[in-house]
Amino acid sequence: MYGKIEKIHFVGIGGIGMSGIAEVLLNLGYKVSGSDLKQSDTTDRLASLGGEIRFGHGRENVADVDVVVTSTAVRDDNPEVVEAKRRMIPVIPRAEMLAELMRMKYGIAIAGTHGKTTTTSMVATVLTHGGIDPTIVIGGKLNTLGTNAKLGQGQFLVAEADESDGSFLKLSPTIAVVTNIDADHLDFYTGGIEQIKDTFVDFINKIPFYGLAVLCLEDRNIAEILPRVKKRFVTYGLSSQADIRATHIRLEGGTTSFVAHYKGYRMGEVSFSMPGAHNVLNALACIAVAMELDVPFSQIQEGFATFGGVGRRFQVKGEVNGITVVDDYGHHPAEIRATLAAGKSGWPERRLVVAFQPHRFSRTRELFAEFVTCFYDADVLVLTDIYPAGEAPIEGVSAERLAEEIRKHGQRDVTYVADREALPEHLLTIVQPGDIVLTLGAGNIWQSGEAFLAKLEEARQA
């Protein structure tokens, strides 16, 4: 960045998308400040790296900064945003700052409605093992790093591309991965799936003439836009028509294995510690990126063997008395189906108890019919109230009504517990040894899983 930019302020610095960029900037030597509503492990880490962290939002927080970075969760009437504009300090979206980082490197941007964080984590792990040493900005904590960001010495930057508000169009990556295209964020994409597809086409076609698009042939919407892609691309999937494909898939507990092929040539077996057939596709995307950067297949295999998963993506939190507690970020019906299928395929003999917290009133309304039928792989389902994520309630949209409709559509064991903090006690009354208890959602449902795990431990020691 131009030399006169010295201090960068993040509004909502504790957010998973903001903190990674802030950490990279700190490692680059910039002065970084930020505000958030509460202290967390993330804010503690940034403070330990030299960040100035303040809790609560106030006009005084932007008095001496050169630029203010905001996420989509920050409203225009935020006092720091208002004061920055009054002082004529530039206020930019998170994606614009990520784009600036990407201009310093060759960018590898992973986009798609689902699977971005896992795929980005796989790419980061495999490229690091392959000697590429990329800079990394991920929307989740990579378990082997203990953080969601790292400044690498190599010439590539690996990052997620967030499509939720179209801001990923600010990025100009050299390699663009699209895992899938689905209907989501319909409060922004008022034109529905066709507008979403158009936006992804624009994103793909922004790569330079020497770049590469990596596209999932298993996804119907991606297949439909292929004729509109004007840049070089490779496809991946399970079909024999895909350039990079998987066969002989094995799902055993928390381990996934498959044989990888490139244009009919059998490359070899890949194995990694993360359950679910959907993660085979994520791994194929990673292989495509690594091959483009000439990472030997043997190093790709070794990289996957070291992959330790990512926070809040089928993350095993602990096990007490034969009861395993798992947490997952899934909050869209397609993600929920894939996550529950992963649990069932990996541990077919175990009962799957799911505690789900819907995320956003608007998403619950727009995808209500899909939510009603996406939980059939759950043996026991408990719903708690919707996590608003800053939204106002919408009349007629509630977790209680969703639970009623799920029950009407054939789900046998469905319970509604309004207060999320009451979930741990409720779970204690219904679980039995051998169960997998899965907390599911993009809000704060993970806290209920940790509280439940603590209660199990207390009961064991009593």
Curated annotation (Swiss-Prot):
GO terms for molecular function: ATP binding; UDP-N-acetylmuramate-L-alanine ligase activity. It is found in: Cytoplasm. Keywords: ATP-binding, Cell cycle, Cell division, Cell shape, Cell wall biogenesis/degradation, Cytoplasm, Ligase, Nucleotide-binding, Peptidoglycan synthesis. GO terms for biological process: cell division; cell wall organization; peptidoglycan biosynthetic process; regulation of cell shape. Disulfide bonds: none annotated. The keyword Chaperone does not apply. Its EC number is 6.3.2.8. One of its GO terms (cellular component) is cytoplasm. Pathway: Cell wall biogenesis; peptidoglycan biosynthesis. It is an enzyme of class 6 (ligase). Gene3D superfamilies: Mur ligase, C-terminal domain (3.90.190.20), Mur-like, catalytic domain (3.40.1190.10), NAD(P)-binding Rossmann-like Domain (3.40.50.720). Pfam families: Mur_ligase, Mur_ligase_C, Mur_ligase_M. Cell wall formation. NCBIfam families: murC. PANTHER family: UDP-N-ACETYLMURAMATE--L-ALANINE LIGASE (PTHR43445:SF3), UDP-N-ACETYLMURAMATE--L-ALANINE LIGASE-RELATED (PTHR43445). Belongs to the MurCDEF family. This is UDP-N-acetylmuramate--L-alanine ligase. It comes from Geobacter sulfurreducens (strain ATCC 51573 / DSM 12127 / PCA). The lineage of its organism: Bacteria, Pseudomonadati, Thermodesulfobacteriota, Desulfuromonadia, Geobacterales.
